[in-house]
Amino acid sequence: MLPSMAATVRQPSALAARAPPFASARDRRRLSQRSATTSGAASPATPRVGRAGSVAGSQPARAVLDPRDRRGYAPARLSSRPLRAVREPASATPVEPSEPAGDASAKHEGQARGEDFELQRAELARLRPLRDAMLRAGSDLASKEKVIASDPRVAAFLDARGPVARVLPNMGSEEAYLVKCVVAIGQEAVLDSRASDDPIHVSNALRALCATLKHVEAFYDMLGGLVGYQFAALELIHEAFGGPPAATSRDLGADAKSALAGSQTQTVSETTPVTVDMHVPPGPDLREGGGEYARLAASWGLRELPKMAEVYPLGGAGDRLGLEDPKTGESLPAALLNYNGRTLIEGLLRDLTAREWLYYKTFGEHVKTPVAIMTSAAKGNHARISSLIREKDFFGRGESGFRLFEQPLVPVVTVRGGAWVVSEEKEMSVALKPGGHGAIWKLMHDQGVFTWLGAKKRVGATVRQITNPMAGTDTTIFALSGVGARENKAMGFASCERHLGAAEGVNVLVERGPDAAGRYAYGVSNVEYTVLQRHGISDEPVAPGSSEARFPANTNVLYIGLEKIQKALESSPRGAFPGMLVNLSKPVTKDGVKGGRLETSMQNIADALEGFSKPGERLPPSRWGELPTFVLYSSRRRITSSAKKKRDVSKPPSSQNLAQTPDGSFLDLLRNASDLLDKCGVAHPKHDGGDTNAYVDYGPGFIFCADPAIGPLWDVTAQKIRGGKLHDRAEVRLEIAETQWRDVEVSGSLLVTATAPLGGTNGQKVNVFDDTKCGRARLLDVTVRNKGVDWSAKGTQAWSATLTRKECCEVTLRGNAEFDARGVKLEGDVKYDVPAGKRLELFAGPGGPADVIERWSDLASDGKPSWQWRYALGEGGMVELELEEAPATHSATKERASARRDGKENVAPESRVGESSAREKPTGAKPSRSNGFVTRKGSVGKTAAPVNAKAAEKRAPTSR
């Protein structure tokens, strides 16, 4: 979160010293020396560092940008209407909740709120000295035990000699300490033994509780462990009720050092007036400039691929998606959602494999990108994800290619003085939730993930969330990593337009200062949508009458510089717990009491990656592109379209009803397919079948889905696929990488599947790229006509690829099999199953295109294919393709066909479609071995490569 928010906690530099890390002695002294009045009873006159509006009469800075700067990080292009920077509201003084006017229920609610406010204030005053003492105790368990045992509540609890107190001497020292912590923070109700006072029963229940709490104690060590977690959560709750700004962030962070080399963050005095202004962040825009800059930036990313890693936060459960285990009824992880015929996690890994295939085809090397995955203990998430990956043989990437680490669950805290929610079903159990995806950075440090990636010589990584299947589209990921790695950036955000009223966070450029040295801090950051108003960000349109919001959307698609993120963790307290908040929007008990858990935001580690101006100066907008953080803009549907929740079928179809649902996400996938087909020159109907109602009720206007390895860059795809037409409700699925499509017309369903689209595997079921051993298909001047999908069939669901087909044209290529069709019309329900080592050619007989003749032959004994695509990185970052083919292909086939008609060649009998089963494959005559390949260049249709790469970089288009 932004620096002025109480939710930002800075991490002391002790993180580098040990794992798990603890707060430094200096930071612990600062915390313990704070008076009890700072939190819960602060004087209205107490100055607040990091709060905006403290300069009387100051005018907000205007985000005036220089449109003439055209470097790779050129400032944003603004609308003609001047945009002023948003300034955070002044810090609120403690407010005694007044009794609201109104009816009896409102009066009662106001009274209850006032009581909650007083409970919170009293509890904070009680906990502060205990939290401070815990920080002074450091990491030594004996020292912490001594502090906790001296707490009056704990002493009274032990003296009472209840069932729990009696078994503590027989428990481990750490477990006994954690139980005492529960008592010290006022949660004795959790320890009630309702079923039995039997010591064995009580001990077992306590051990189960402690198994969870020890992870909370370890993860929040820098805040004071379990005590610090409770205190920080209660501070934020109290602030939301009108209490003073939470002080934890300032107390921990005042002495932090900047993650930037050579930049020292000096201590800010308590009276230094500090303001926080938020601007629309500038950045290059992949949507503009004819695609030249997008192509160039993507080529940078392609070159940097051997230095990249992938990071996936997969902690979310699929509750809102309605995903359940059919046997147990338990919620399944969102990663297991069957989206377009495969799980979401498989979709992300297919995108990654496609980028690796492009690198292999371009540079001849098989790069194996390491994948780090953050799971959660919630509802068996970790176990299910681990099991899925193993069942899928690690998706052909090998066990050493993955590193899974588990996010801890944290207690839910209510507004009633911070009381935990006690489970009614399980003895000594509390409601637990994941603590937000911001935990990912500290976990990567504590569990050695950064070390693992460093050993693999990785310098950067792209971060994607599991519920967003769209981020791998075209140039997005390549360009983001390319810009980040080439410019040695610390962090980058892929951003896009945000619709007014959308429930999503925004990206901002924060200008904060001055500090004690007179410097201003700058950096791109994120503001969660739940706190937009708190930061003075209203939902204004970018221009009058526009439906696009002024600030761009945060998409959770990130680039990170691994070393810089590590340094931020080790030198800035904000890195460990970025963007802390407690969301109180929902009730957490049966009687409607609200509460939440302490959460952190993954993106807000950017707040620990700031750049600084010179003392006494502000950094001019023309230099904002030099900051360690950046934004890269693209079209929304090229970056994000999430599948987070199930569509409400009781409501009429609308864009709002489809938002964040699998139905809506798949519609965006088809919009992208429509754009791609336009680029390829393939005519097609409207993607939604006419409108949203038609899409929901009758299905999409067409379906076009392809293995991303066909590209994944659209420039590459457009050289393989050119011309043709998809008729209304046509379905095309190309699960193949090596293919050539020229003027293909489809009415119905066309399914082409290669069982080895990228080559083979080794004995350990690990993918081995080999473009001489993959299946390949050519369709030239081919017409496909059949009845296709039965859209009225029960259970039809386009987004999950749950379809019933009346008829289809299906081609299956096993191993290195080849399928070659030219000038034919394939009608009705036809299936071709080509074995490995075989080649099937289809050509027109005497009766015309519908008179389809088959010719089967063996592939060359030396293993060479009859044709293949050659890739090369050309001018301006264009990946250029050339088709190399052996001489004896279609032309030789035509000659043989003519000879057969004249009775001059003795060959195996020809077969026509429908006359031979796919199970019966005539061997035919072996073709002569190729003496070489004939090269034929591909093209990209309407898109041309830039004349000069430097010119493209200088003309880098910008947004906003």
Residue ranges: model-predicted function:
Residues 63, 78-107, 891-960:
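N-terminal plastid-targeting presequences
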Residues 94-303, 483-903, 909, 932-933:
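Left-handed beta-helix
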Residues 273-312, 320-605:
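Domain-scale recognition of functional cores that engage charged ligands
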Residues 7, 36-37, 45, 92, ...:
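Intrinsically disordered/low-complexity terminal segments and short unstructured peptides
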Residues 1-64:
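N-terminal chloroplast transit peptides
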